[in-house]
């Protein structure tokens, strides 16, 4: 959650511990080549970027296997739920931002094998497609074009395929705008299709599709 990020930062400042957080694909040579191509003006002005992360498998949709024999005696549910103070901060944040419909308070405190093994499916513990997959695509674009923080971002989507009680969307579309750079980026994802459209940079003179390999 957002409050937790500030808590982590505060602990790092107070303790002086070394903390490293990264994205997937930082070692990818093709991003450096794509940056070079755009920097040399081969595409002309780039006004539209499209990225996606489609998946089409239970594991890709976070429906992980439940280990046989798992029960309240073999799982520390209180540890999984976390510190009461952290839970209170989370609840306060969700309430103040009028996100109560995503909390599911009755279910959160009830022992659940699905929630323990498939925690990514609930806002209570996860950031869903945006924080799990979109973040890597955004970082890739930022490596290539140094877009920084957008002027605005809007999202839409829902739970349209996996009707398993999850609260995070299995379909998501997000639009980022940089008016000062005359640039828009579109992100879309579905967990019910394996059609991968790659990363497409659309310029006035040419377009370029970027994969993870040269």
Residue ranges and their predicted role:
Residues 32-33, 45, 50-54, 59-214:
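Contiguous beta-strand/loop segments that form the cofactor/metal-binding neighborhood of enzyme cores
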Residues 37-40, 140:
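A generic secondary-structure signal
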Residues 5-11, 29-38, 57-63:
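Pocket-flanking alpha-helical
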């Amino acid at each position: 959650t957002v409050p937790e990020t500030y808590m982590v930062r505060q602990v790092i400042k107070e303790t002086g511990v070394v903390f490293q957080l990264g994205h997937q694909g930082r070692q990818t040579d093709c991003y450096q080549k794509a940056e070079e191509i755009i920097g040399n003006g081969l595409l002309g002005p780039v006004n539209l970027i499209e990225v996606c992360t489609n998946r089409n498998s239970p594991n890709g949709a976070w429906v992980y296997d439940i280990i046989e024999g798992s029960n309240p005696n073999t799982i520390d549910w209180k540890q999984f739920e976390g510190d009461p103070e952290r839970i209170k901060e989370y609840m306060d944040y969700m309430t103040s931002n009028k996100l109560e419909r995503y909390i599911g308070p009755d279910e959160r405190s009830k022992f659940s094998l699905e929630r323990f093994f498939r925690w990514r499916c609930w806002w209570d513990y996860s950031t869903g497609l945006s924080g799990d997959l979109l973040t890597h695509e955004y970082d890739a674009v930022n490596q290539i074009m140094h877009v920084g923080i957008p002027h605005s971002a809007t999202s839409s989507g829902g739970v349209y395929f996996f009707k398993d009680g999850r609260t995070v969307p299995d379909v998501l579309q997000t639009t980022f705008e940089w008016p000062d750079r005359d640039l828009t980026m579109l992100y879309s994802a579905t967990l019910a299709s394996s059609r991968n459209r790659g990363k497409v940079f659309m310029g006035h003179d040419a377009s370029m599709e970027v994969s993870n390999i040269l």
